Amino acid sequence: MATTAQELQTTKTMLPPGPRPLPYIGHLLPLRQDPLGFLQQLQRTYGNMATIYVGKNPAVLLFRPEHVRYVLVEHPRHFSNRGVLQGNSEDNNTSEGLLTIDGEKHRQQRRAVQPAFHKKQVESYAAIMEQYTQELLKTWHAGDTVDMSRAMQELTLHIVSKCLFSIDLSSQLGPLSDAFDGIIGTSTSMAESLLNIRIDNPITGYGKRMAASRQLDMLIYTLIAQRRDDDRDYHDVLSMLMSAQGAEEPGTKLTEKQIHDHILTFLAAGHETTAIALVWTFYLLSQYPQVRIKLQDEIRSVLAGREPTLDDLARLPYLDWVLNESMRLYPPAWLQLRFVAKESELDGVRLPVGTMVVLSQWVIHRLPDIWQEAEAFKPERWDPANGQQIPPGAYFPFGGGPRTCIGMPLAQLEARLILTSILQHYTPQPAPGYTPGFQPVITLRPKQHLRATLMPAFSSDSDAQWQQLARLNDKAIQEGAERQGCRNALLSLFGL
């Protein structure tokens, strides 16, 4: 029998301490206004654990790496991905994608598509990633101002749709990116998400997401119908889904809705997190020019003017450190929720069935007792020669345990190839005074799109040129110079 909110309320004296909740709404106000700052302040004030209330329902916040291991790795079956607040799984509005299903159903369907993410299969996607990235670069020119947020969303959507579903969406990237932005970008605050508010009208975040989802339904169901009429085996995720066994009864296949929800999940999660990781990385590199110069030096030394290949990536260790550090500071997946499915005891605290538990990458990735200069962007901390020991569970941008993001190898390869290809040619430089802000929804997005001027790439031996270029760019922006005039000046400066 499901545990009710009222029953959970009776256990509040057994849970860890936390700030006093307001009647009826609990801590919804700080969760809505500044969830990132609120979670960090709770950790500083209460230490390893804290309890807050989402309305009348308690949520236990776990702030230590050992808690991450306990929940995600050591006892994953004690913690469900769905809770009593999320409604009946038979609800037609409940997603049946890999991110939301649980138990044996999740294990069975994950196994069905796992071959698409094996090492050799993922490596076969490298040619597609590089092809689409080079096609994008051919449309860019030094001096152009580019919406990097939008460009990375469309590029990663283009790549994931081809790699996983063998479809070329080049003619539909704009509308599809808008639709996914409607699902993810209009995702509600942490407070509304935790309450699972489902009011389908144009005002609510849920209503906006539903409207955007309906735009994608026609594309996805058409794709399924076309594949059913196609006898070829594409050896892609869609083929695997269509031949996968259902978990309800032996010999059954996945339903149309289940296949639809898997496709939607892979398309959304498969492009959004990588795009955000890249945007945050470009922003950090603009704030730490010494890191950017060192990375571009490494790229230039290894590639010697060639387009990057899969084999080149093994010779770019600093690239990996930069991406690791970027996802430590600005993890695209910044929060993970679980619900206690089997009564558990953690650090002497009893967690009753139905209790919501919260693990935050944003907080744990910044714990000062684990990360020296935790707020600083220091890729060198990932150099094995430095001897820094990172405890298991202290870094989990892709989750952990049996629910580790299935697309992690693909996302890592994609980010490495895209970042290398762009930095080989350009240095994206945001306008002076640009402040990204935070939009912590399903993912941790910059609140303001990153619009950047494409400076020609350079290395440490041309740093004086960079200073001159930066001054020229600042002057052009301040004086409102015409874009073409600014571009011509940039090209002239570099003799292009």
Indicate where each model-derived feature is located.
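Conserved cytochrome P450 K-helix E-x-x-R motif and the immediately C-terminal K′/meander segment
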Residues: L28-G47, M218, T222, R306-D347
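Cytochrome P450 heme-thiolate monooxygenase catalytic core
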Residues: A2-T13, L39, S80-D91, K105, ...
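N-terminal membrane-proximal hinge/A-helix region immediately C-terminal to the signal-anchor transmembrane segment
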Residues: A2-T94, I101-Q108, E123, A127-E135, ...
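Cytochrome P450 catalytic-core helices
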Residues: T273-E298, P409-Q424
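Conserved cytochrome P450 K-helix/beta-meander segment immediately N-terminal to the heme-binding cysteine loop
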Residues: P76, L359-G387, Q468-L469
